[in-house]
Amino acid sequence: MNGARELLLVLMAWGAAQGASAQNAATVNPELVRVRYIVNDVPASVAFYTTNLGFKLDMQSGPYFAALSRGGVQLLISPAKGPGGASQPMPNGERPAPGGWNRIVVYTPDLQGEVDRLRKAGVRFRNEVVVGLGGNEILVDDPSGNVVELFQPTYGATPK
């Protein structure tokens, strides 16, 4: 019963943050791209994305959920364990876990400057800068081991 109560509180907070009245429901943009990352610690992940990568906190429901945005993408952060649907096991028993190789890509006009700034902030890197055909990239881990790619296009322009 405690898990159901916690889930209800999360949903109520989410609804309140979204202005879940019939009038305001029409303002939610169904075209907005949303990405969900499973994390070990929602507050630590919120701090990482807002402090280091320029995301804006849209809403947070304690340690159970947060929505952040940057440009036209909304990042949904859910814990690996908790009352929310994203943390529930699959029918085969497999549980959601952070990490892996799927990733969001953050464009930057100055990759080396970002690398220097993030190294000083103690961010963990998976590799060194890779020079590719379309640009240069490097991979960093968020506090839960989810990958974020920092990318500078070959021509130095950030897509609009």
What are these regions (language model features)?
Residues M1-L8:
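Bacterial N-terminal signal peptides that target proteins for export
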Residues S45, Y49-T50, L118, G145:
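Conserved active-site tyrosine of GNAT-family acetyltransferases
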